[in-house]
Amino acid sequence: MMYRVNHIMRTINEMSSYTPHMKVNRIAERLSKVQKISFCISVISFFLLAIITLTYGPFNTKSNLSFISALSLYFINVIMGVTYLSVPVINTIKYIYNFKGEVVNELIYDIDSDEQHIEALLPYSLEELTYVSNCIQVRIPKIKSKCFLWGGGKTAIISILCLSYSAICIVNGGSIDGIFVGETGDKIIVAIMFFILYTSLMNMFFKQKLLYLQNLKMIIDMTIKIKRNFT
């Protein structure tokens, strides 16, 4: 028997465009967008700064324009990094200030969103939904195995800020030695920062993918329970 897996996956893929009927927490939604945008800008500006730093000496690109560009990218990094790290603090303060209201609003938002998603999956049979749920379940452990034990957005931003500082010091006429603790220690610190940045970015990717699959499985499993109990 051929199940309509492709149809179900298309329906699931379209769920991202669904929006709950009531936007009960617009401030949190906007803060989340600000955090995502600031992270993307921070990563892009860091890689541009890294390119300028790598070409600054060996390729004789030293000029006022290069230095001003590097300095501008550094300040953009600092501003975006501080913005990214500040959003969770603002969210926490807002949550504590109106704890009951935030909990209720979050619950209403989640239930309303889940109901729309479940409604879109109800036309499919129990066998089809169970099959897709099992397919997702099989893939979840594989993604979990690729995740590191630590690392995420905050560690990525902190490592970017440290590496950006070392980059601007090099562009300003210094060297990698003497930026933090001196000589070999600085090279080790920079290497560790690059490793932290790499693991953090990989962790963010795989955890986002894992969270997405877990949410899909939860919605499909809820749909299965509803079909079994009420149809």
Swiss-Prot record:
Keywords: Cell membrane, Membrane, Plasmid, Transmembrane, Transmembrane helix. The keyword Transmembrane applies. It comes from the Bacteria. The chain crosses the membrane at residues 39-59, 70-90, 156-176, 189-206. Its main location: membrane. GO terms for cellular component: plasma membrane. It is found in: Cell membrane. The keyword Transmembrane applies. Signal peptide: none annotated. It is a multi-pass membrane protein. Belongs to the FliR/MopE/SpaR family. This is Uncharacterized protein YuaM. It comes from Escherichia coli (strain K12). The gene is yuaM.
